Amino acid sequence: MEKKIGFIGCGNMGKAILGGLIASGQVLPGQIWVYTPSPDKVAALHDQFGINAAESAQEVAQIADIIFAAVKPGIMIKVLSEITSSLNKDSLVVSIAAGVTLDQLARALGHDRKIIRAMPNTPALVNAGMTSVTPNALVTPEDTADVLNIFRCFGEAEVIAEPMIHPVVGVSGSSPAYVFMFIEAMADAAVLGGMPRAQAYKFAAQAVMGSAKMVLETGEHPGALKDMVCSPGGTTIEAVRVLEEKGFRAAVIEAMTKCMEKSEKLSKS
């Protein structure tokens, strides 16, 4: 990719994008400009990755073809309003702020701007993220492909229509927390059975990771994969019976429904 890439803000998620992009070799460090309000942080990123340290958000906006706005949602609109006059005509702005809609972004930047709303999740920090990419009507297929390729440097990415953002929050953005709870609960049970805790976490986490990989790589329905493990009269079907009796599926569905409702409510506030 020959385009210049800019970052305004570079917290954990911004750094995950930056690191994944450089590691992929898609762009050279010299093609990247980063600005954060902390000079020490920018200097550290320069030392670690060899990127260009910008002196202002406006400098990033003037130079970069693709600008990742990676600041907190509460200040996103203010930051974008301050750079809009510095953007080039064909600049593409990618927001990774949860809850900030395309319309809100366009009101800050101008309705003639190319904007993408993206939502990566925290496994991006270990190169296993899942990112939704939602372009506005002005974004070209080439622009979208460039952004998808960037997010695929540290996981998977898919184009999602904006009304589907709330299900994305439930099934991807927030779901690592549910999975961590499941891993913790399984490990607690293993500890109860006598296994050392560190070993219990490793067994539980590897089982979850391996199971997810089977879903993705085999293309089999999760229910069919579950049935493969459940021998007649065996230990696994006994565990499944208890989970069903305790409302495991219903609890997950209800929790995600509430998560989606909260996401929709927050986007309107």
From Swiss-Prot:
Pathway: Amino-acid biosynthesis; L-proline biosynthesis; L-proline from L-glutamate 5-semialdehyde: step 1/1. It holds the Pfam family F420_oxidored. One of its GO terms (cellular component) is cytosol. Keywords: Amino-acid biosynthesis, Cytoplasm, NADP, Oxidoreductase, Proline biosynthesis. InterPro entries: 6-PGluconate_DH-like_C_sf, NAD(P)-bd_dom_sf, P5C_Rdtase_cat_N, P5CR-like_CS, P5CR_dimer, Pyrroline-COOH_reductase. It is found in: Cytoplasm. It comes from the Bacteria. It comes from Escherichia coli (strain K12). Catalyzes the reduction of 1-pyrroline-5-carboxylate (PCA) to L-proline. Does not catalyze the reverse reaction. Gene3D superfamilies: NAD(P)-binding Rossmann-like Domain, ProC C-terminal domain-like. It catalyses: L-proline + NADP(+) = (S)-1-pyrroline-5-carboxylate + NADPH + 2 H(+); L-proline + NAD(+) = (S)-1-pyrroline-5-carboxylate + NADH + 2 H(+). This is Pyrroline-5-carboxylate reductase. One of its GO terms (molecular function) is identical protein binding. Its EC number is 1.5.1.2.
